[in-house]
Swiss-Prot record:
It comes from Polaromonas sp. (strain JS666 / ATCC BAA-500). Keywords: Repressor, Ribonucleoprotein, Ribosomal protein, RNA-binding, rRNA-binding, Translation regulation, tRNA-binding. One of its GO terms (cellular component) is cytosolic large ribosomal subunit. Binds directly to 23S rRNA. The L1 stalk is quite mobile in the ribosome, and is involved in E site tRNA release. This is Large ribosomal subunit protein uL1. The keyword Hydrolase does not apply. Part of the 50S ribosomal subunit. The keyword tRNA-binding applies. Signal peptide: none annotated.
Protein backbone atom coordinates (compact mmCIF):
# COMPACT_ATOMS: atom_id res chain seq x y z
CA UNK A 1 0.00 0.00 0.00
CA UNK A 2 1.46 3.37 -1.04
CA UNK A 3 2.23 5.95 1.58
CA UNK A 4 0.09 9.05 1.87
CA UNK A 5 1.69 12.29 0.76
CA UNK A 6 2.11 15.03 3.34
CA UNK A 7 -0.74 16.98 1.72
CA UNK A 8 -3.05 13.94 1.71
CA UNK A 9 -2.33 13.36 5.39
CA UNK A 10 -3.04 17.00 6.20
CA UNK A 11 -6.35 16.83 4.33
CA UNK A 12 -7.23 13.56 6.06
CA UNK A 13 -6.52 15.13 9.44
CA UNK A 14 -8.70 18.19 8.76
CA UNK A 15 -11.56 16.79 6.68
CA UNK A 16 -13.84 13.96 7.78
CA UNK A 17 -15.32 12.41 4.63
CA UNK A 18 -18.34 11.19 6.60
CA UNK A 19 -19.14 14.51 8.25
CA UNK A 20 -21.65 17.09 7.04
CA UNK A 21 -20.13 20.56 7.34
CA UNK A 22 -21.88 23.90 7.63
CA UNK A 23 -21.71 25.58 4.23
CA UNK A 24 -19.33 28.35 5.33
CA UNK A 25 -16.97 25.80 6.90
CA UNK A 26 -17.11 23.54 3.84
CA UNK A 27 -16.24 26.41 1.51
CA UNK A 28 -13.46 27.51 3.85
CA UNK A 29 -11.89 24.05 3.75
CA UNK A 30 -12.17 23.81 -0.03
CA UNK A 31 -10.52 27.23 -0.43
CA UNK A 32 -7.79 26.27 2.05
CA UNK A 33 -6.80 23.20 0.06
CA UNK A 34 -7.18 24.80 -3.39
CA UNK A 35 -3.46 25.36 -3.85
CA UNK A 36 -3.04 25.20 -7.64
CA UNK A 37 -1.16 28.06 -9.27
CA UNK A 38 -4.30 29.28 -11.03
CA UNK A 39 -7.60 30.60 -9.73
CA UNK A 40 -9.42 27.28 -9.33
CA UNK A 41 -13.16 27.09 -9.90
CA UNK A 42 -15.32 26.17 -6.93
CA UNK A 43 -17.72 23.45 -8.00
CA UNK A 44 -20.77 21.79 -6.53
CA UNK A 45 -22.36 18.37 -6.98
CA UNK A 46 -25.97 17.90 -5.88
CA UNK A 47 -27.46 14.41 -5.61
CA UNK A 48 -31.21 14.64 -6.24
CA UNK A 49 -33.90 12.23 -5.13
CA UNK A 50 -35.21 11.60 -8.63
CA UNK A 51 -35.20 8.78 -11.16
CA UNK A 52 -33.23 10.26 -14.05
CA UNK A 53 -34.40 7.42 -16.31
CA UNK A 54 -37.94 8.80 -16.22
CA UNK A 55 -38.58 11.58 -18.71
CA UNK A 56 -40.87 13.43 -16.30
CA UNK A 57 -38.10 13.61 -13.70
CA UNK A 58 -35.40 15.25 -15.80
CA UNK A 59 -34.33 18.37 -13.93
CA UNK A 60 -33.10 21.13 -16.22
CA UNK A 61 -32.95 24.89 -16.11
CA UNK A 62 -30.83 28.00 -15.71
CA UNK A 63 -30.11 30.50 -12.96
CA UNK A 64 -28.28 33.80 -12.80
CA UNK A 65 -25.73 33.57 -10.00
CA UNK A 66 -25.95 36.84 -8.01
CA UNK A 67 -22.18 37.15 -7.74
CA UNK A 68 -21.24 35.91 -11.21
CA UNK A 69 -19.00 33.00 -12.12
CA UNK A 70 -15.66 34.75 -12.40
CA UNK A 71 -15.58 34.03 -16.11
CA UNK A 72 -16.45 36.42 -18.92
CA UNK A 73 -18.64 34.59 -21.41
CA UNK A 74 -18.71 35.27 -25.13
CA UNK A 75 -22.26 35.19 -26.45
CA UNK A 76 -23.41 34.43 -29.99
CA UNK A 77 -26.95 35.32 -31.05
CA UNK A 78 -29.02 34.18 -34.01
CA UNK A 79 -31.34 37.09 -34.76
CA UNK A 80 -32.16 39.57 -37.50
CA UNK A 81 -33.53 43.09 -37.87
CA UNK A 82 -34.55 44.84 -34.66
CA UNK A 83 -33.80 41.75 -32.56
CA UNK A 84 -30.23 41.69 -33.87
CA UNK A 85 -29.78 45.34 -32.90
CA UNK A 86 -31.22 44.65 -29.43
CA UNK A 87 -28.78 41.77 -28.97
CA UNK A 88 -25.82 43.95 -29.97
CA UNK A 89 -26.93 46.73 -27.62
CA UNK A 90 -27.19 44.20 -24.78
CA UNK A 91 -23.57 43.17 -25.28
CA UNK A 92 -23.67 40.17 -27.63
CA UNK A 93 -20.23 39.38 -29.07
CA UNK A 94 -21.43 37.83 -32.33
CA UNK A 95 -24.80 38.36 -34.05
CA UNK A 96 -25.92 36.84 -37.33
CA UNK A 97 -28.12 34.39 -39.19
CA UNK A 98 -26.96 32.40 -42.23
CA UNK A 99 -23.52 34.00 -42.01
CA UNK A 100 -23.11 32.89 -38.38
CA UNK A 101 -24.30 29.38 -39.27
CA UNK A 102 -21.70 29.22 -42.05
CA UNK A 103 -18.93 30.18 -39.61
CA UNK A 104 -20.03 27.46 -37.20
CA UNK A 105 -20.12 24.85 -39.96
CA UNK A 106 -16.59 25.92 -40.88
CA UNK A 107 -15.46 25.22 -37.33
CA UNK A 108 -15.27 28.80 -36.07
CA UNK A 109 -16.89 28.77 -32.64
CA UNK A 110 -15.40 31.54 -30.54
CA UNK A 111 -18.26 31.68 -28.01
CA UNK A 112 -19.51 30.07 -24.81
CA UNK A 113 -23.28 30.58 -25.13
CA UNK A 114 -25.66 30.53 -28.11
CA UNK A 115 -28.99 32.37 -28.00
CA UNK A 116 -31.64 32.39 -30.72
CA UNK A 117 -34.85 34.23 -31.44
CA UNK A 118 -37.68 31.78 -32.29
CA UNK A 119 -37.71 32.74 -35.98
CA UNK A 120 -34.01 31.83 -36.24
CA UNK A 121 -34.52 28.21 -35.20
CA UNK A 122 -35.02 27.18 -38.83
CA UNK A 123 -31.32 27.95 -39.25
CA UNK A 124 -30.13 26.85 -35.82
CA UNK A 125 -31.91 23.52 -36.26
CA UNK A 126 -29.44 22.57 -38.99
CA UNK A 127 -26.57 22.94 -36.50
CA UNK A 128 -27.80 20.39 -33.98
CA UNK A 129 -25.06 17.85 -34.65
CA UNK A 130 -22.42 20.53 -34.10
CA UNK A 131 -23.85 22.51 -31.19
CA UNK A 132 -25.64 19.67 -29.40
CA UNK A 133 -22.62 17.57 -28.35
CA UNK A 134 -20.93 20.74 -27.07
CA UNK A 135 -23.90 21.69 -24.89
CA UNK A 136 -24.44 24.84 -26.94
CA UNK A 137 -27.77 24.11 -28.65
CA UNK A 138 -30.32 26.83 -27.76
CA UNK A 139 -33.30 25.56 -25.78
CA UNK A 140 -36.41 27.38 -24.52
CA UNK A 141 -36.24 25.44 -21.22
CA UNK A 142 -33.07 27.30 -20.26
CA UNK A 143 -34.07 30.62 -21.79
CA UNK A 144 -31.75 30.52 -24.80
CA UNK A 145 -34.57 30.38 -27.35
CA UNK A 146 -36.56 33.52 -26.66
CA UNK A 147 -38.04 36.59 -28.36
CA UNK A 148 -36.39 38.67 -25.61
CA UNK A 149 -32.83 38.17 -26.83
CA UNK A 150 -31.59 41.29 -25.03
CA UNK A 151 -32.48 39.94 -21.58
CA UNK A 152 -31.02 36.53 -22.46
CA UNK A 153 -27.73 38.18 -23.45
CA UNK A 154 -27.64 40.26 -20.26
CA UNK A 155 -28.32 37.16 -18.15
CA UNK A 156 -25.54 35.22 -19.87
CA UNK A 157 -23.12 38.08 -19.32
CA UNK A 158 -24.22 38.49 -15.70
CA UNK A 159 -23.29 34.94 -14.74
CA UNK A 160 -26.17 32.70 -15.75
CA UNK A 161 -25.38 29.00 -15.53
CA UNK A 162 -27.35 26.13 -17.01
CA UNK A 163 -27.91 22.90 -15.13
CA UNK A 164 -29.12 19.46 -16.07
CA UNK A 165 -29.26 16.28 -14.03
CA UNK A 166 -27.04 13.46 -15.29
CA UNK A 167 -27.90 9.76 -15.56
CA UNK A 168 -26.89 9.22 -11.93
CA UNK A 169 -29.30 11.88 -10.68
CA UNK A 170 -26.53 14.41 -9.99
CA UNK A 171 -26.38 18.07 -10.99
CA UNK A 172 -22.88 19.50 -11.42
CA UNK A 173 -22.18 23.23 -11.47
CA UNK A 174 -19.65 25.97 -10.84
CA UNK A 175 -20.40 28.64 -8.23
CA UNK A 176 -17.34 30.84 -8.62
CA UNK A 177 -13.59 30.95 -8.11
CA UNK A 178 -11.21 30.44 -5.21
CA UNK A 179 -10.60 34.21 -5.22
CA UNK A 180 -14.27 34.86 -4.35
CA UNK A 181 -14.94 35.54 -0.69
CA UNK A 182 -16.94 32.91 1.16
CA UNK A 183 -20.11 35.01 1.34
CA UNK A 184 -20.26 35.36 -2.46
CA UNK A 185 -19.80 31.62 -2.95
CA UNK A 186 -22.52 30.95 -0.37
CA UNK A 187 -24.88 33.34 -2.17
CA UNK A 188 -24.25 31.68 -5.51
CA UNK A 189 -24.81 28.18 -4.14
CA UNK A 190 -28.00 29.29 -2.41
CA UNK A 191 -29.28 30.67 -5.73
CA UNK A 192 -28.51 27.38 -7.50
CA UNK A 193 -30.20 25.32 -4.79
CA UNK A 194 -33.26 27.60 -4.94
CA UNK A 195 -33.45 27.07 -8.72
CA UNK A 196 -33.18 23.31 -8.25
CA UNK A 197 -35.98 23.39 -5.67
CA UNK A 198 -38.21 25.29 -8.08
CA UNK A 199 -37.41 22.75 -10.81
CA UNK A 200 -38.41 19.80 -8.62
CA UNK A 201 -40.55 17.35 -10.64
CA UNK A 202 -44.06 16.86 -9.30
CA UNK A 203 -43.55 13.10 -9.49
CA UNK A 204 -40.43 13.17 -7.28
CA UNK A 205 -41.16 11.63 -3.87
CA UNK A 206 -39.17 11.51 -0.65
CA UNK A 207 -36.04 13.52 0.05
CA UNK A 208 -35.24 15.73 -2.95
CA UNK A 209 -31.88 17.25 -1.95
CA UNK A 210 -30.06 14.10 -0.89
CA UNK A 211 -26.41 15.16 -0.89
CA UNK A 212 -24.47 18.34 -1.59
CA UNK A 213 -20.69 18.54 -1.87
CA UNK A 214 -18.35 21.38 -2.80
CA UNK A 215 -14.88 21.04 -4.29
CA UNK A 216 -12.27 22.92 -6.30
CA UNK A 217 -10.84 22.11 -9.73
CA UNK A 218 -7.81 20.26 -8.38
CA UNK A 219 -8.84 19.87 -4.77
CA UNK A 220 -10.81 17.85 -2.29
CA UNK A 221 -14.58 17.48 -1.98
CA UNK A 222 -16.39 18.40 1.24
CA UNK A 223 -19.95 17.36 2.05
CA UNK A 224 -22.39 20.08 3.07
CA UNK A 225 -25.23 20.06 5.61
CA UNK A 226 -28.15 21.15 3.40
CA UNK A 227 -29.84 22.77 6.40
CA UNK A 228 -27.11 25.43 6.38
CA UNK A 229 -27.78 26.56 2.80
CA UNK A 230 -29.96 29.65 3.11
CA UNK A 231 -31.86 30.58 -0.04
Amino acid sequence: MSKLTKRQKTIGDKIDSNKLYALSDAIGLVKEFAVAKFDESIDVAVQLGIDAKKSDQVVRGAVVLPNGTGKTKRVAVFAQGAKAEEAKAAGADIVGMDDLAAEIKAGKMDFDVVIASPDAMRIVGTLGQILGPRGLMPNPKVGTVTPDVATAVKNAKAGQVQFRVDKAGIVHGTIGRRSFDTAKLQGNLAALIDALQKAKPASSKGVYLKKVAVSSTMGVGVRVDTQTIAA
